[in-house]
Amino acid sequence: MPGKKSPAGEFAARKLREKRKKFRWKDERYKRRMLKLDEKADPLEGAPQARGIVLEKVGVEAKQPNSAIRKCVRVQLIKNGKQVTAFCPGDGAIDYIDEHDEVVIEGIGGPKGRAKGDIPGVRYKVVKVNDVALSELLKGKIEKPMR
């Protein structure tokens, strides 16, 4: 009779636990997390927010069945020079952002750190313009400072 693959016994717990760990590498999410693959590919390098300079304003067409041009900006990050597209949330928000402004961007909050809703390929949103919160500019509480 051939031997058993698993150890059985009162003191076999450590061996059993180590054995189970091997199978976790078959799980794609576990593998990505352990090898830090998403962090390596992330333009923000794992940080929650990043500063950047606005290069240009761009209009991104919404995916079907919606029909709109979502107002976005191309931003060059200060810390590594990478370029990303960031969404400008709010009615008329794009009017408060000019080229060469310094903006702070953060993740847009889509599933698995990806794009949200009908805006294809846009993973970030603008939070601040020239060190003033975009939401405050939209409410009219603060005027945008000149840099």
Curated annotation (Swiss-Prot):
Stored SUPFAM superfamilies: Nucleic acid-binding proteins
Any single GO BP term: translation
Entry protein name: Small ribosomal subunit protein uS12
GO cellular component, one term: small ribosomal subunit
SUBUNIT field: Part of the 30S ribosomal subunit.
Lineage: Archaea, Methanobacteriati, Methanobacteriota, Methanomada group, Methanopyri
GO molecular function: rRNA binding; structural constituent of ribosome
Domain of life: Archaea
Gene name, Swiss-Prot/TrEMBL: rps12
Source species of the chain: Methanopyrus kandleri (strain AV19 / DSM 6324 / JCM 9639 / NBRC 100938)
